UniProtKB/Swiss-Prot annotation:
Belongs to the eutherian X-chromosome-specific Armcx family. Keywords: Repeat. Highly expressed in the developing neural tissues, neural crest derivatives and hind limbs. Residues 15-26 have a biased composition (Polar residues). This is Armadillo repeat-containing X-linked protein 5. The gene is Armcx5. Residues 40-59 have a biased composition (Basic and acidic residues). ARM repeats lie at residues 349-388, 470-509, 511-551, 568-606. PANTHER family: ARMADILLO REPEAT-CONTAINING X-LINKED PROTEIN 5 (PTHR47081:SF2), PTHR47081.
Length: 606
């Protein structure tokens, strides 16, 4: 409908101009000028609206579109009327700037701009020059149509704020029951201005476009083009220093401290064995050429078993080997201490230092030659300053006297009562002493056999024999009486059996006694006691005896040749072994868990 009305008006204007005397260019210019002048004089009250409209036209002339290429507005009318319309538009373009309602437009931030979008049903493309001429030509027709159709309204609201406020352009138009709205909002300061332009477009219908915040950039691009991507850059220059975003420093993960893996139990064990170490002064029968001629006595480091292994009791010098210190060296050290005083670099834990004169030292050495008691030698080493001493030990030695204490220990008869049990020296005894000991062991074995059966004296003698059988030196004497002890094992009480089994257990640890222990008589007696009614202690002892025999037999099997055993002995051994195997199977169901474990381990070893 809108297009048909526009075409009808164009035809009327073209028909009037086609009459004689009116189709000249001068008549067309005059007609357009008269129409423009009449329109301005007829409505003086609408000066503000015309001024806003002129600003819109100026904006259309100066502001380029989104695309930088020039665009034209093409009106689809008859080809023979194009020249007349073009001349009318050119005349209107030249006269509009002279009108009182036009305000020249400059690109300033303080001057508010207005936007009027008038679209007909025909194809529209925005151009800076042609659009202004079209609006100037259609101005008169719009004024005449205001009185005929009051229901068509058009409102343009332009709101702008200088500073940080918002700028809003609202274009409202109505055509019958349809309405659309264009809102452009921008912020530029704290002030606001508002321009409202109302116009009525006769038979033309405006298209109103509503925009939201999302389409803000797209709508603004119709009127402003630039390289600035933000709306705020239209009113103030781009900030030189952009906002800095706070970023927390990266967290540095601290490595956890390694846990304390110190073994305090080992420290306690080490402290325990340190208290039991000692050094023995022993004579050297064959003097070595490297030692001084007067150095007949040396301090020999005793090797003991510690939690960390076998270690010497004294310090090892850099060159290696045992730690030897002659008495001459000790005398020189004593003279140096007497001359220069005590060494300041000594351990502070020593509250008092020993002062030993050379005469006292010689007397002490003479006393040490009379005894081999390790306790007396330990005290002597503390007095000489070789081994550390505790404060209370130092006080006792000083109160009693050094030489007096050693002399009392040497002359004490209790010190000579059990010299063998206290002596730990590895050197062999003298031949006379060995003979005396062997005679003593032989006498003990005879006393055991001569005593009444199951008497208390017999039990005590067996206990003494157990202590003498600990060392391998006298096993050759005890093994001679094994066949007599087997008879006591079969006839004696529980206590007698227990002590005899202890003696056999000590003998089974020696490899030289293996052949005698695996004889037919011993094996049969041990197997006979291997039943559930026997006491737990006796069964455990028998199991240990067989474990030792099995270990020694497998370790040195090549030594047991056919010449060592007769045929009857080998048959009896295998026969007893078969019976022993059956009894082991029966003891796997023993009520005591310790016995069951021992039996199972022995079966696995065999």
């Amino acid at each position: 409908m809108i297009g048909s009305k526009t075409k009808r008006k164009a035809r009327e204007e073209s028909g009037a101009s086609s009459k004689p005397g009116t189709n000249s260019p001068a008549n067309a210019k005059g007609k357009a000028k008269n129409q423009t002048t009449k329109a301005v004089k007829a409505e003086p009250k609408e000066e503000w609206g015309n001024q806003a409209e002129a600003r819109d036209e100026a904006v259309a002339r100066t502001q380029p579109a989104i695309s930088t290429e020039p665009k034209t507005v093409t009106w689809k009318v008859k080809k023979k009327k194009d020249k007349t319309n073009a001349r009318v538009m050119a005349q209107a373009k030249t006269e509009l700037p002279a009108g009182p309602a036009l305000v020249p437009h400059t690109k300033s931030d303080a001057l508010p701009t207005s936007v009027v979008i008038t679209v007909t049903k025909s194809e529209v493309k925005i151009d800076t020059g042609i659009e202004a001429s079209l609006k100037g030509a259609a101005k008169a027709t719009d004024k005449r149509s205001i009185k005929q159709k009051p229901e068509i309204k058009k409102e343009v609201c332009v709101k702008s704020r200088a500073g940080d406020k918002a700028k809003e352009v609202c274009v409202k138009s109505s055509a019958g029951d349809k309405a659309k709205e264009v809102c452009v909002k921008s912020r530029a300061g704290d002030k606001a201005k508002e321009v409202c332009v109302k116009s009525r477009a006769g038979d033309k219908a405006s298209i109103v476009i509503n925009t939201t915040d999302e389409d803000e950039d797209y709508v603004c691009s119709w009127f402003w083009t630039g390289e600035e991507p933000s709306v705020g850059s239209w009113f103030w220059p781009k900030e030189e220093n952009p906002l800095q975003v706070y970023q927390p420093p990266p967290k540095v993960e601290e490595e956890p401290e390694p846990p304390d893996t110190f073994d305090y139990a080992l420290k306690k064990k080490a402290a325990a064995w340190l208290r039991g170490r000692f050094i023995v002064l022993v004579p050297i029968e064959e003097p070595q050429p490297s030692l001084p001629p007067d150095g007949n006595w040396t301090l020999v480091a005793t090797l003991i078993e510690t939690p960390l292994g076998i270690r010497p009791l004294t310090k090892i010098p850099p060159y290696g080997g045992p730690y030897f210190q002659t008495l001459a060296d000790l005398k020189n050290q004593i003279r140096e201490k007497e001359k220069y005083g005590p060494n300041p670099n000594t351990c502070r834990c020593k509250s008092r230092t020993f002062s030993l004169e050379p005469v006292d030292f010689d007397k002490l050495v003479a006393l040490l030659k009379l005894t081999r008691d390790p306790f007396i030698h330990e005290i002597a080493t503390m007095i000489m300053g070789i081994s550390p001493a505790y404060p209370f030990t130092q006080d006792i030695v000083h109160d009693v006297g050094i030489t007096v204490m050693i002399e009392n220990f040497v002359n004490n008869p209790n010190a000579k009562k059990y010299p063998r049990t206290l002596n730990i020296n590895a050197n062999p005894d003298a031949p006379e002493e060995v003979k005396e000991t062997e005679a003593h062991v032989n006498k003990v074995c005879r006393d055991i056999l001569c005593c009444p059966l199951n008497c208390s004296v017999q039990v005590e003698e067996l206990k003494l024999l157990v202590s003498l059988s600990v060392k391998f030196d006298y096993h050759h004497v005890v093994i001679y009486y094994v066949r007599y002890f087997i008879s006591l094992l079969n006839k004696g009480s529980v206590k007698i059996k227990f002590q005899i089994l202890r003696v056999l257990l000590c003998l089974s640890k020696n490899q030289a006694n293996t052949r005698e222990l695996i004889s037919a008589e011993v094996m049969s007696s041990l197997v006979a006691l291997f039943h559930k009614n026997e006491s737990k202690a006796n069964i455990l002892h028998i199991i240990e005896i067989f474990e030792n025999i099995n270990f020694q037999f497998k370790k040195r099997a090549k030594l047991f040749t056919k010449e060592m055993f007769t045929k009857s002995e080998l048959i009896s051994i295998f026969r007893e072994a078969k019976e022993f195997d059956q009894k082991l199977q029966d003891l796997t169901d023993h009520s005591d868990p310790d016995v069951r474990d021992k039996v199972i381990r022995l079966i696995l070893k065999l």
